[in-house]
């Protein structure tokens, strides 16, 4: 009788695990479905959302961390452009806030480099977040256009879209 009880418990745990997995997949699919169509600008895909920069940035950081990823570097682009404006002769401030967050997935990068060791240049991945001085009510999130000639890059691009979808649904 103990054997049947143990098997029943194992099935119960398996059932809960499968249910949780199904819910997670459904959540990921619904997030992807909520992702608006990006505006394609040059080599970038740009998503725009109303809100405050710091709130959307916090949501972006959380979405990256929720994927189990660690931000390895933050490029403070607006600060750099402001700091170097005199030296470069810049007369117009384009961004109120602008950063690029860099991170990588060991699993995806391993797959990319296994198929082609030169794909290491595709890591780290980045998502830029910024507000334009001409449009302070909206926050922009942008990623590089997908590397269409790199079939292996599709998983990376899907990850970036998942992160943006999660950011926009907070």
Give the location of each predicted region.
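Bacterial N-terminal signal peptides that target proteins for export
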Residues: 3-18
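N-terminal signal peptide c-region/cleavage motif recognized by signal peptidases
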Residues: 27-29
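Terminal, regulation- and interaction-focused segments at domain boundaries
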Residues: 32-68, 75
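Solvent-exposed, acidic/flexible segments
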Residues: 49-57, 74, 91-94, 149-153, ...
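Structured segments of extracytoplasmic/periplasmic soluble domains
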Residues: 59-70, 74, 87, 163-170
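Compact, glycine-rich, soluble single-domain proteins
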Residues: 67, 72-122
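Beta-strand/loop substructures that line and gate deep hydrophobic ligand-binding cavities in soluble
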Residues: 123-150
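C-terminal partner/receptor-binding element of secreted or periplasmic proteins
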Residues: 140-170
């Amino acid at each position: 009788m103990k054997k049947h009880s143990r098997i029943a418990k194992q099935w119960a745990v398996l059932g809960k695990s499968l249910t949780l997995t199904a819910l997670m997949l459904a959540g990921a699919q619904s997030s992807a479905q909520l992702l608006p169509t990006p505006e394609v600008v040059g080599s970038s895909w740009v998503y725009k959302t109303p809100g405050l920069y710091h709130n959307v940035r916090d949501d972006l950081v959380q979405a990256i961390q929720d994927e189990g990823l660690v931000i390895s570097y933050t490029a403070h682009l607006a600060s750099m452009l402001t700091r170097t404006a005199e030296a470069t002769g810049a007369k117009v401030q384009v961004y109120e806030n602008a950063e690029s967050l860099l991170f990588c997935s060991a699993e995806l990068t391993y797959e990319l480099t296994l198929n082609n060791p030169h794909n290491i240049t595709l890591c780290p991945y980045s998502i830029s977040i910024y507000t334009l001085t001409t449009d302070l009510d909206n926050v922009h999130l942008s990623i590089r256009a997908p590397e269409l000639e790199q079939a292996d890059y599709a998983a990376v691009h899907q990850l970036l879209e998942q992160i943006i979808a999660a950011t926009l649904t907070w």
